[in-house]
């Protein structure tokens, strides 16, 4: 399934033009090692399921092995995530769906070295989020 892909297909890299009912993709990243629709799907999940952009801008506290933060609920993102998850389950094999979920986890793991240099608390948060996502797969 290798195809040309956006390379960084998160919700923050999309613009919706309501009067034209059109979506415009911005900030393509062509230097990815994986050029796959599965990787693009995982980046959409990074935004809609894992709420990367929201969590990345939150203040959080870390207390022993607990990560505490108030995550606001945005109905539009929740609805988008529900539609995306249904689409993936209906159109992908179980194995491909699992690959997408593992790639979603990898989106957070790959950021750990960068977050360690910039914001060590965010590194811990993303590690915790990756662990939570992995635990959900195991269930």
Segments the model singles out, each with a brief description of its role:
Residues 1-37:
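Active-site acidic catalytic loop and adjacent metal/ATP-binding pocket
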Residues 1-4, 16, 29, 41, ...:
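Sequence-level detector for tyrosine residue identity
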Residues 21-31, 81-95, 133-137:
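Short amphipathic alpha-helical segments and their helix-coil junctions
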Residues 21-23, 95-139:
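Regulatory N- and C-terminal appendages and interdomain linkers associated
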Residues 29-88, 105-120:
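Active-site activation/catalytic loop segments of kinase-like enzymes and analogous catalytic loops
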């Amino acid at each position: 399934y290798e195809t040309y892909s956006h390379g960084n297909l998160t919700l923050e890299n999309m613009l919706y033009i309501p009067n034209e009912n059109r979506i415009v993709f911005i900030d393509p990243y062509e230097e990815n090692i994986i050029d796959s629709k599965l990787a693009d799907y995982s980046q959409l999940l990074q935004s809609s399921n894992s709420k990367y952009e929201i969590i990345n801008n939150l203040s959080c506290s870390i207390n022993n092995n607990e990560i505490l933060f108030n995550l606001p609920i945005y109905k539009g993102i929740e609805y988008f995530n529900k539609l995306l998850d249904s689409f993936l389950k209906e159109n992908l094999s179980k194995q491909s769906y699992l690959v997408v979920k593992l790639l979603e986890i990898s989106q957070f793991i790959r950021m750990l070295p960068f977050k360690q240099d910039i914001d060590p608390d965010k590194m811990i948060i993303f590690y915790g989020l990756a662990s939570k996502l992995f635990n959900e797969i195991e269930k």
